[in-house]
Amino acid sequence: MQLHLKEKVLYAKNTVMSNGVTVATYENITHIGMIGLGRMGANLVRRITRAGLHAVVYDTNAEVAKSLAAENPDHITAISSISEFATALPGQRAVWVMVPAGTITESVITELQHTLSANDIIIDGGNSYYRDDLEHSKQSATKGIHFVDVGTSGGVWGLERGYCLMIGGDAEVVTALSDVWNAVAPGVEAAPRSPGLSGDITPAERGWLHCGPSGAGHFVKMIHNGIEYGLMAAYAEGLNILKNANEGLKPRTADAETAPLAHPEHYQYEFDVAAITEIWRRGSVVASWLL
């Protein structure tokens, strides 16, 4: 498939200011690379291309990349190596990395730093540690490459619901990727507008936010995950109590290894825990997608 090179794409242009300093100015990026086509990576590509943007995709399993490209051949191109991003993406290149955090991400980012050129963009959308982002940003900057970290929440349900995006990096670069963020995020329709808000719809209301400089996106995602795990732990503890609220109905052996139940008459409830969670999902203050 041939990329539509004549369409408007996002790229950086060098502009010489009156003080003699050369800076980069940006237009909106409409072509993006994606490395890692697991359930989230592939669904991100589907949302991006359903919005009319273009994607160049790579996965270590070449058949996965070819299969995804076959779903939308006018907007998705499969390549067989990371080095091909240098020629497959037009204008300013932006490549989104969606692989497991740690050594795999480290290896991919290093290869991209040797593949891309000044003013290109590396996007880490995995669950990397924010302090690693700081180092990746510094390393990329030595080659003039921009680094953007994106805490991506939405899981396998994001294809239909959209993805919440917590973003760190230079403001101008993040803004240049607005079309991509808007394609991926849930959109303003995902939730009622918060009381007190008025005027133009903000990016946060669309489901994405520039949280700050390098590392800010993954820092916010780290806290998000901590809250998520805390919620799941609270649910688990509470539901376990409900499940075992019938202990007073069970025979208990009196021995050194069995704690006595002081008032068995207080614990004689046979709760339908699944049904309780169903009602909690409907109007309860503890209602949550996690339920």
PLM segments and residue spans:
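General beta-strand structural signal in soluble alpha/beta enzymes
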Residues: 78-79, 124, 146-150, 190-192, ...
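Beta-loop-alpha module in the N-terminal Rossmann-like domain of NAD(P)-dependent dehydrogenases
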Residues: 83, 95-111, 129-132
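Rossmann-fold NAD(P)-binding glycine/threonine-rich loop
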Residues: 121, 125-174
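Helical "substrate-binding/catalytic lid" subdomain
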Residues: 162, 166-168, 176, 183, ...
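Low-complexity, intrinsically disordered or signal/transmembrane-proximal segments
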Residues: 2-4, 11
